From Swiss-Prot:
Encoding gene per record: 14-3-3zeta
Subunit structure of this chain's protein: Homodimer.
Function: Adapter protein implicated in the regulation of a large spectrum of both general and specialized signaling pathways. Binds to a large number of partners, usually by recognition of a phosphoserine or phosphothreonine motif. Binding generally results in the modulation of the activity of the binding partner.
A GO-annotated cellular component: cytoplasm
Location of this chain's protein in the cell: Cytoplasm
Annotated keywords: Cytoplasm
Keyword Cell wall biogenesis/degradation tagged: no
Statement: the UniProt record of this protein carries the keyword Cytoplasm: yes
Protein name: 14-3-3 protein zeta
One Pfam family named in its UniProt record: 14-3-3
UniProt lineage: Eukaryota, Metazoa, Ecdysozoa, Arthropoda, Hexapoda
Primary subcellular site in the record, as a coarse category: cytoplasm
Cysteine-cysteine disulfides: none
Length: 247
């Protein structure tokens, strides 16, 4: 007997409260596969679930990669670290392709308004970006292209159809600028994009929606933090730029 949609959503909310994000993602994947367009709440649950599931692997990957580089003197330790990194990479890739499959098969084709379309295209850009973080050679070239195309498509729709203060438009600008900085190594383009988004939002602060005021101002702060980080000459090695979450 199939579980109904409301029950799956409730299960996802329970899992979120228990911080069991793998369960949360599994429930929201099932909801998505019913083929019905997601509500805003469901869309956010899906995004939060996978953001946490993939985030844990991204964080692990960074730690293991760092250890691998520091154990150059000991071949055995380095080999262990390498094998463990490869295991985490495999998990990370599987999660990303899971999400990208849901986006291409269900979410993007069913998106009936610009807000949803931008949200899902941004998500597509994000998950190809996560693949790019661990990819090398020809594979990296391919996922970088896919990420840039998804972000660019989302960016054009957001500029044409959404207020500069809309949290989804701001979150997209934040993550697209991180893509330029971290993946394409283009700090000038990253700063230009982030600054433009920040300035455009400041110029139209009166259009800030009361419901999304907190989200919008938080992302504006993150844009400004990244600009400060990227333009300072004393940038430390360990500084990670801020990314937008689940707007």
């Amino acid at each position: 007997m199939s579980v109904d949609k409301e029950e799956l959503v409730q299960r996802a909310k329970l899992a979120e409260q228990a911080e069991r994000y793998d369960d949360m993602a599994a429930a929201m994947k099932e909801v998505t596969e019913t083929g019905v367009e997601l509500s805003n709440e469901e869309r956010n649950l899906l995004s939060v679930a996978y953001k946490n599931v993939v985030g844990a692997r991204r964080s692990s990957w960074r730690v293991i990669s760092s250890i691998e580089q520091k154990t150059e003197g000991s071949e055995r330790k380095q080999q262990m670290a390498k094998e463990y990194r490869v295991k985490v990479e495999k998990e990370l890739r599987e999660i990303c392709y899971d999400v990208l499959g849901l986006l291409d098969k269900h979410l993007i084709p069913k998106a009936s308004n610009p807000e949803s379309k931008v949200f899902y295209l941004k998500m597509k850009g994000d998950y190809y970006r996560y693949l790019a973080e661990v990819a090398t050679g020809e594979t990296r070239h391919s996922v970088v292209e896919d990420s840039q195309k998804a972000y660019q498509d989302a960016f054009e729709i957001s500029k044409a159809k959404m207020q500069p203060t809309h949290p989804i438009r701001l979150g997209l600008a934040l993550n697209f600028s991180v893509f330029y900085y971290e993946i394409l190594n283009s700090p000038d383009k990253a700063c230009q994009l982030a600054k433009q988004a920040f300035d455009d939002a400041i110029a139209e602060l009166d259009t800030l929606n009361e419901d999304s005021y907190k989200d919008s101002t938080l992302i504006m702060q993150l844009l400004r933090d990244n600009l400060t980080l990227w333009t300072s000459d004393t940038q430390g090695d360990g500084d990670e730029p801020a990314e937008g979450g689940d707007n």
